[in-house]
């Protein structure tokens, strides 16, 4: 029983940690490409900014879904009932 709970805690930590790492890398790439595009064509900066914020919101949504799944795994462990 303790090993299942331990492995669940490790899985939750990896899920949240890797989600945060992926989001950080994604935001870095997104911001860099936005600045590159705005520097090349300054007249397109407002349109690019709107698209950047939409993609940033989607990037955050994916991470929040991962956090929700991790918390579900943490508090309602379905494998614990099988023992």
Curated annotation (Swiss-Prot):
GO molecular function terms listed in the Swiss-Prot or TrEMBL record: lipid binding; proton-transporting ATP synthase activity, rotational mechanism
InterPro entries in the record: ATP_synth_csu_bac/chlpt (IPR005953), ATP_synth_F0_csu (IPR000454), ATP_synth_F0_csu_DDCD_BS (IPR020537), ATP_synth_F0_csu_sf (IPR038662), ATPase_proteolipid_c-like_dom (IPR002379), F/V-ATP_Csub_sf (IPR035921)
Alphabetically ordered keywords of this record: ATP synthesis, Cell inner membrane, Cell membrane, CF(0), Hydrogen ion transport, Ion transport, Lipid-binding, Membrane, Transmembrane, Transmembrane helix, Transport
Predominant location: membrane
Membrane topology according to the record: Multi-pass membrane protein
Quaternary structure and partners: F-type ATPases have 2 components, F(1) - the catalytic core - and F(0) - the membrane proton channel. F(1) has five subunits: alpha(3), beta(3), gamma(1), delta(1), epsilon(1). F(0) has three main subunits: a(1), b(2) and c(10-14). The alpha and beta chains form an alternating ring which encloses part of the gamma chain. F(1) is attached to F(0) by a central stalk formed by the gamma and epsilon chains, while a peripheral stalk is formed by the delta and b chains.
Designated name of the protein: ATP synthase subunit c
Source organism: Shewanella amazonensis (strain ATCC BAA-1098 / SB2B)
